[in-house]
């Protein structure tokens, strides 16, 4: 089984948190709301990976003013690829508290939508199990 280290930013701006709705046809949690993030490449430093994933998935304009390592977790997930293939992967999640100076987001093809969500509204979203666990641990659910 392949192992991946995943960096996940919990991005906050003016009391709201950024959630991204995964594309319906790919990823570990197709069609559900999640935190952005992705895999650390070989030889890449953790913060470099986090900033690269944010640029790739959320665009160049989103400006982070704070990045603080927060927690980690792990589990085994099945990833669905755009061509329909599936793969079981051991995932190690490194989650960071982040603050953004703006809300300028331009999502890539991994997502179909995004939202800045106040804590009291998080319960109304179809959150994937990993995001739900993270938000509970943070005291937001």
From Swiss-Prot:
Belongs to the Nudix hydrolase family. NudI subfamily. GO terms for molecular function: dCTP diphosphatase activity; dTTP diphosphatase activity; dUTP diphosphatase activity; magnesium ion binding. This is Nucleoside triphosphatase NudI. Catalyzes the hydrolysis of nucleoside triphosphates, with a preference for pyrimidine deoxynucleoside triphosphates (dUTP, dTTP and dCTP). The keyword Transmembrane does not apply. The lineage of its organism: Bacteria, Pseudomonadati, Pseudomonadota, Gammaproteobacteria, Enterobacterales. NCBIfam families: PRK15472.1. HAMAP family: Nudix_NudI. InterPro entries: Nucleoside_triphosphatase_NudI, Nudix_hydrolase, NUDIX_hydrolase-like_dom_sf, NUDIX_hydrolase_CS, NUDIX_hydrolase_dom. Its EC number is 3.6.1.9, 3.6.1.12, 3.6.1.-, 3.6.1.23. Gene3D superfamilies: Nucleoside Triphosphate Pyrophosphohydrolase (3.90.79.10). Monomer. A motif (Nudix box) lies at residues 38-59. It comes from Escherichia coli O17:K52:H18 (strain UMN026 / ExPEC). It catalyses: a ribonucleoside 5'-triphosphate + H2O = a ribonucleoside 5'-phosphate + diphosphate + H(+); a 2'-deoxyribonucleoside 5'-triphosphate + H2O = a 2'-deoxyribonucleoside 5'-phosphate + diphosphate + H(+); dUTP + H2O = dUMP + diphosphate + H(+); dTTP + H2O = dTMP + diphosphate + H(+). Residues 1-141 form the Nudix hydrolase domain. It is an enzyme of class 3 (hydrolase). The keyword Magnesium applies.
């Amino acid at each position: 089984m392949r192992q991946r280290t995943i960096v996940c930013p919990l991005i906050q701006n003016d009391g709201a948190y950024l959630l991204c709705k995964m594309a319906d046809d790919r990823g570990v949690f197709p069609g559900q709301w999640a935190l952005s993030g992705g895999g650390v490449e070989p030889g890449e430093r953790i913060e470099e990976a986090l900033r690269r994933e944010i640029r790739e998935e959320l665009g160049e304009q989103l400006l982070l003013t704070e990045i603080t390592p927060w927690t980690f977790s792990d589990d085994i997930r099945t990833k669905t690829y755009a061509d329909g293939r599936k793969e079981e992967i051991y995932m190690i999640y490194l989650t960071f508290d982040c603050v953004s100076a703006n809300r300028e987001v331009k999502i890539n093809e991994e997502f179909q939508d995004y939202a800045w969500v106040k804590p009291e509204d998080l319960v109304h979203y179809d959150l994937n199990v990993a995001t739900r666990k993270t938000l509970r641990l943070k005291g937001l659910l």
